[in-house]
Design a protein with these regions (language model features):
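Short, well-ordered beta-strand elements
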Residues: 39-52, 72-77, 102-103, 148
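Extracytoplasmic "Venus flytrap"
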Residues: 43-61, 81, 395-398
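Long, aromatic- and glycine/proline-rich binding clefts that accommodate carbohydrate-like moieties
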Residues: 140-141, 300-305, 353-406, 413, ...
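Hinge/lid segment of periplasmic solute-binding proteins
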Residues: 107-158, 198-199, 213-214, 299-305, ...
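Extracytoplasmic/periplasmic solute-binding protein
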Residues: 148-152, 157, 182-234, 278
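Extracytoplasmic "Venus flytrap"/periplasmic binding protein-like
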Residues: 65-136, 140-142, 167-176, 272, ...
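Short, solvent-exposed loop/beta-turn-alpha elements that line the ligand-binding surface or hinge
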Residues: 122-133, 193, 201-202, 206-210, ...
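Glycine-centered hinge/linker elements that transmit conformational signals in sensory
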Residues: 184-186, 232-263, 307
């Protein structure tokens, strides 16, 4: 389903472009850098956050500041947009021992997969600077004591809602639980369609078979006490709580959510929301800044709340981006200087004030200017401290991409009515046990 309204989707970059850029650097300027003094060195960086025009312009200014202070130039390589393609590109470059890029953007679920290919940043970054970040993020970016990357920005799953519509339909606050969400979404949707908004929906979210669906479905099932797939060294996904959560989500399709949501990526749901065609949306907390862009119909009509709670309570996955230095870099010290600069308190504060992207340094959440400019960050911090759940990337290590794919494909089969939730959970349990060589809990196998 194609979304209407203003598009905010960044252009995706292809493998070919990335490869061509790397080839030019390896055969030209990149090969000559080793003979230059530190002040003349060029560091190359690859990161998905910088692939759209607006971000490129902002970050170019950041890099100019870094160059002015250090004398080190920085070149940014384009990257593919989807996370799965990014990881494949990163792994291909690293497997070829390419000396560029020097610095890579690292998703919080990748450290276990890529750890062997990156330097330990503790060798180059002072401990006081590392300790300034949320300790949970530092732990997530560490593998056996090795700091693979330093965090730069983060996000948590959150519920976006149209405050004007809630007031119009007599609601004083956002839904506390999934049942309230369903009732409120249905009522507002019915009312808006009666007013002539035929394409209006109650609740939109990314349902395409992708990492975004893994995050969504984990939040559904964990909030209902269904766990996070791999727990205590066992595969736990086949349980009645997960089944119930998936069944509920499947009922949303065609009811309060568009049938086409099963093909929505994150930007699709953001586009629909930004066009004013939905009452509620699940997105990352940083989506607040995107949907408040100049000219957006929802600019002054939205608020952000924690996701609805289930029987267990609220459950929100988190995302984070950090920077790591390739062990194949010819200039690891200078590359680490760039990482330290980008992840520093001053730079994160500046970036947050300009873009609204949540920082990874706790004390910035009490900065008066930051709080005044982006009040949604208080919700972000509340969710982070009370309701956070992790994807099973640490528990599964290098197998995580296969685990996540198996998971989101199983959930997607339920959403598209290809199989029942109970059948999908049972088949997924067997599949994950085969992929990971882990067992089911003793109680699930009939053992005493």
């Amino acid at each position: 389903m194609k979304c209407s309204g203003p598009s905010v989707v960044p252009r995706a970059r292809s493998y070919v472009v990335v490869g061509a850029c790397v080839l030019v650097l390896l055969t030209g300027q990149g090969c000559r850098e080793s003979s230059k003094p530190a002040a003349g060195i060029t560091i190359t960086l690859i990161h998905q956050l910088w692939s759209d025009k607006g971000s490129q312009q902002r970050m170019n200014e950041t890099l100019k500041t870094f160059t002015a202070r250090s004398g080190i130039r920085v070149e940014v390589l384009p990257a593919p947009e989807p996370a799965v393609e990014q990881l494949a590109t990163w792994r291909s470059l690293l497997a070829g021992r390419a000396s560029v890029p020097d610095v890579y953007g690292i998703d919080v679920i990748w450290p276990e997969i890529l750890a062997d290919e990156f330097v330990d940043l503790r060798t180059y970054i002072p401990e006081r600077e590392i300790a300034a970040h949320f300790p949970e993020l530092i732990a997530s970016y560490s593998v056996k004591g090795k700091l693979v990357a330093l965090p730069y920005t983060m996000a948590v799953g959150a519920l976006f809602y149209r405050v004007d519509l809630l007031r119009q339909y007599g609601y004083r606050e956002p839904p506390k639980n999934w049942e309230e969400l369903e009732a409120m979404a249905a009522r507002i949707q019915k009312g808006e369609r009666a007013r002539g908004h035929a394409d209006f929906w109650g609740y939109v979210w990314p349902g395409a078979p992708s990492e975004a669906l893994t995050c969504n479905a984990l939040e559904w099932q964990a909030s209902e006490s269904g766990g996070t797939v791999i727990e205590n060294g066992t595969v736990t996904v086949d349980n009645p709580h997960s089944v119930r959560a998936w069944e509920r989500a499947a009922r949303w399709l065609g009811s309060i959510s568009p049938p086409g949501v099963v093909a929505y990526k994150e930007w699709d749901s953001l586009n629909l929301w930004q066009a004013g065609q939905a009452a509620f949306m699940r997105s990352w907390s940083f989506g607040y800044v995107i949907v408040r862009a100049a000219g957006s119909p929802t600019r002054d009509r939205l608020q952000v709340a924690p996701l609805p709670e289930g029987r267990r309570g609220v459950a929100a996955t988190f995302a984070a981006t950090g920077y790591g230095v390739s062990r194949h870099s010819r200039h690891p010290r200078e590359a680490a200087m760039l990482v330290g600069f980008l992840s520093s308190r001053d730079e994160q504060r500046r970036n947050c004030l300009i873009t609204g992207m949540p920082p990874t340094i706790p004390d910035l959440y009490s900065d008066p200017e930051v709080v005044a400019e982006y009040p949604y960050l208080s919700t972000h911090l509340q969710v982070y401290r009370k309701s956070l759940i992790s994807r099973p990337s640490t528990a599964t290590g290098k197998l995580y991409p296969a685990v996540s794919r198996a998971y989101f494909e199983a959930v997607h089969s339920v959403l598209t009515r290809k199989t029942s939730a109970a059948q999908a959970a049972a088949a997924l349990q067997r599949n994950l046990m085969q992929i990971t060589a882990l067992k089911a809990p003793a109680s699930a196998t009939g053992a005493p």
